[in-house]
From Swiss-Prot:
Superkingdom, natural source: Bacteria
Lineage: Bacteria, Pseudomonadati, Pseudomonadota, Betaproteobacteria, Burkholderiales
Gene it is expressed from: fusE
Membrane-crossing segments per the record: none
Function: Involved in the resistance (detoxification) of the fungal toxin fusaric acid.
A matching Pfam family: HlyD_D23
Name assigned to this protein: Fusaric acid resistance protein FusE
């Protein structure tokens, strides 16, 4: 997903220009301080030149920090999934705004599917941990896996009698 980067790109370019100007000012003030050190001038002039050079160093560091922040923001305008997978629960459309902390979609890792099944106890005699499992999808496909665990007394949202059971 790509957030329009044009605003962020402009901010990076502006920060680059400010950093370049600060670097130039820093070089000029350092040069002035070095020139004064070689000349016979008052202590006050030397101190002023040293303070001016220190101030230019600080302004340059501040400009570099601002550039780093703008670059980081530009990088974040491109949202990349942490895993290969499938997008589900997509709740966004072209032109929508992204809001920090508000989920707009979910990603199902294509290398790690989990299926929770609800079975009545009378239909469990062959279900054992580690046993192969096969699931027939409504689309006609078949998924294969294995039984990882068995739990008892699981909450079933479709069964009103299970409202007091542990929810998983």
């Amino acid at each position: 997903m790509q957030i329009d980067p044009s605003h962020y790109q402009i901010a990076v370019e502006q920060a680059q220009a400010v950093a370049a100007a600060a670097r130039s000012c820093r070089c000029r003030r350092r040069g002035r301080r070095a020139d004064l050190d070689a000349l016979v001038v008052s202590k006050e002039n030397r101190e002023n030149a040293a303070h001016s050079a220190s101030s230019a160093d600080a302004q340059y560091q501040q400009a570099i920090a601002a550039l780093d922040a703008r670059s980081s923001t530009l990088e974040r305008s491109r949202v990349v999934a942490p895993v290969d997978g499938y997008i589900t629960n997509l709740q966004t459309f072209k032109g929508n705004y992204a809001v920090a902390g508000q989920a707009k979609l979910a990603i199902v890792d294509s290398h790690s599917f989990w299926v929770y099944g609800y079975f009545e106890e009378t239909k469990l005699p062959r279900v054992k941990i580690g046993a192969p499992a096969e699931m027939r999808l409504m689309s006609g496909g078949v998924m294969k896996g294995h039984v990882e665990s068995i739990s008892r007394g699981i909450y079933d949202r479709d069964n009103p009698q299970s409202r007091d059971l542990v929810r998983t």
